[in-house]
């Protein structure tokens, strides 16, 4: 039997999913693609400045798969899944690949540089997470809980804590989503486990309608402090501007 709290969390999730376009619209297509314009200090911190300044991405919605192109070389692209990641050329020849990629980050901190295949893993799971939220939260294996509301800059946000299934590659098992009065996700908190558990407060804005689904076109990520506030305005860890968005 579901508790009152579980019913409240489910109602909040349904409200959020509906505000983003609804499951029916989301399930009409199998992929989301966009041009990404990225910046922020993270890329230099991990040893790859400029690597994703202007890049194209496609993520699947019915399985965990993402590809970025061109990736580090105009002829290369990535093929990411939770358990395997590869860099390939235009002929689909494998340039580099790695199974169980998450294990390769053991002992890493925010100051540890990444290999190019590790960069492919991070960018792959990150964009998949962003493109699929909140629609996947009702899938088997996900657990949701409503937290106490949060007030920021005079605005009240409802909060949904999501525990991801073990088989899904993402920032951390437990993440928190801040939902405004219209049902849109405006902030997303997580720890970056592959970078020593670095804390993040990730802000979403400038939503547009893409074939019936609401997608945030601007994302800015800051350090999340112990009091749950962002360290603002610097350092800006990551910024992502999405353009040329399409669903197929």
PLM-predicted stretches and their roles:
Residues 13-17:
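Short, Gly/Pro- and small/polar-rich lid/capping loops
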Residues 23, 73, 135-146, 157, ...:
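Intrinsically disordered terminal and processing segments
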Residues 26-27, 43-45, 130, 190, ...:
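Tryptophan-centered motif/residue detector
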